[in-house]
Amino acid sequence: MIKRRHKMRESVFKALFQWDFQKDEDLTEIAKQHVSLLEDEKLREQAYSYIEGIKKTIESLDEIISKYLQNWTLDRLSVTDRNILRLGTYELLYVDDVPIEVTLDEMIELGKTYGTENSGKFVNGVLDRIAKGEAPKEKFDM
């Protein structure tokens, strides 16, 4: 299940990445080409749930991320790091069944795979601060 959920997160990340270059396009439409590659219907539904949730909360996600960036602004981040942080922040704050450690590990892996050699550490540092400052207290007991 973990490997399959990783693929789901990866498809959401790819859609967010592409959307960052095509802001005038609908994120859900962009996501279709990435999410459709997932073999499991339940994972496709989950991916669309993430996409819709991120669309609805993008402004607050960006505000929260900006609050925890040190010596950076959101628009100065690489497209990769910015969208991994959006996905990770959404999962930390709005997805109840995923422990904080799992979210951090998954986002670090996406950073290592798609970002620079420092992306994993950078993403981990920012998301760790966001988790400590913003995540629901119940997530610390999972």
Curated annotation (Swiss-Prot):
* InterPro entries the record matches: NusB-like_sf, NusB_fam, NusB_RsmB_TIM44
Q: Which UniProt keywords apply?
A: RNA-binding, Transcription, Transcription antitermination, Transcription regulation
Q: Which GO terms describe its molecular function?
A: RNA binding
SUPFAM superfamilies the UniProt entry points to: NusB-like
At the top level of its lineage, which domain of life is listed? Bacteria
Q: Mind telling me which Gene3D superfamilies this protein's record contains? A: NusB-like
What this chain does, per the entry, is described as: Involved in transcription antitermination. Required for transcription of ribosomal RNA (rRNA) genes. Binds specifically to the boxA antiterminator sequence of the ribosomal RNA (rrn) operons.
Q: Extract the NCBIfam families matched here.
A: nusB
One GO term of the biological process aspect = transcription antitermination
Q: Which CDD domains match?
A: Terminator_NusB
Which Cys pairs does UniProt list as disulfide-bonded?
A: none
The similarity annotation says: Belongs to the NusB family.
GO cellular-component terms in the record?
A: cytosol
Q: What name does this protein carry?
A: Transcription antitermination protein NusB
Any matching Pfam family: NusB
